[in-house]
Amino acid sequence: MSIKLIAGNWKMNTSLEEANQLIDEIIKNLEDGDLSAEKKVAIIPPFPFIDLVLNKIKTIPNFYVGAQDCSPFDNGAYTGDVSAKMLKSLGVEYCIIGHSERRLHHQETNLTLSEKVEQALNNDIRPIFCCGENLEIREANQHIEFILKQLYDGLFFLPKEKIVKTIIAYEPI
């Protein structure tokens, strides 16, 4: 049986008050809809609002919270980083890794992303591994090779039992 995941990334948007209103609206809309066992919803708020969202959705079946990123490190003197262990202790189930905006604005390499994937999996968090090409690469007809390299460098070091726990999100830029 294939399970569908619908994930909503809030990016760096909303104040605390807006986040509260937004999650209430999402919950109301989902309660009015069809959220069966074959469908899961993951809300991926900014870090400061993870706990707020978790507390609001904890009794709703098939409704989960994800993180927008995690550190490639388990712990230590990495100011501003949030470890997968910390995220799991909150109750986070999913983590976006390799989003095009982080690759671009934070110069994240495939090696760094592979370390983040490993951290997520080691802490029982399902990575949502993003891959995709920009228009220039697509128009040059190099998109297949480009995406395969992202996947190979980011995931193919993993054993099969860990790869199958990873969700791949294709996001052309």
PLM features: what roles do these ranges have?
Residues 1-173:
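Active-site loop-to-helix "anion-binding N-cap" substructures in soluble metabolic enzymes
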